């Protein structure tokens, strides 16, 4: 995808947009323009995940649809935090070749590093929380399914049940 007319893009701004507005694709729109397909492709899973959060707040934690929707938001957040890390730690020469050929954009190396560190903390938190949430709900669902089954007759022992 090509960069929009008007040229120079700051590495610092791109890093912080990915950190603060990543799930909405703001960093992609800044670098590639409003017509960027990848930027718009972040909206559906973000909105679906936010809807899952809203469902859980409204209907409680027993809502099984929310179990499926909420991890999408966590995964989008983790993915965009990875993008912020990549942007923040990209070498200056490579960044200037790709996004700032005129060299006009001002970037602050320390703000890039701080943004990358913050993105690492936030992304790791989102990924771990999403994984823990999915695993907890999966095991709760399994326990619910086991408790719904009728118990085995009391007069049979384990050895009798295993015989053909």
Kindly label every feature range from the protein language model.
Residues 2-15, 39-164:
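Transmembrane helix recognition focused on a "late"/terminal membrane span
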Residues 17-29:
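N-terminal signal-anchor/start-transfer transmembrane helix
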């Amino acid at each position: 995808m090509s960069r929009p007319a008007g040229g120079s893009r700051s590495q610092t701004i791109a890093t912080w947009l990915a950190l603060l507005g990543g799930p909405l694709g703001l960093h992609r729109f800044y670098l590639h323009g409003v017509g960027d397909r990848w930027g718009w492709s972040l909206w559906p899973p973000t909105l679906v995940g936010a809807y899952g959060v809203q469902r859980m707040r409204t209907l409680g934690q027993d809502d099984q649809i929310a179990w499926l929707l909420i991890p999408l938001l966590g995964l989008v957040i983790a993915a965009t935090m990875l993008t912020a890390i990549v942007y923040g730690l990209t070498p200056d020469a490579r960044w200037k070749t790709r996004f700032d050929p005129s060299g006009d954009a001002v970037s602050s190396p320390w703000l890039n590093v701080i943004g990358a560190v913050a993105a690492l903390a936030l992304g790791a938190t989102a990924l771990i929380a999403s994984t823990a949430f999915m695993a907890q709900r999966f095991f709760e669902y399994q326990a619910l399914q086991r408790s719904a089954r009728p118990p085995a007759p009391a007069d049979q022992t384990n050895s009798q049940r295993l015989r053909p």
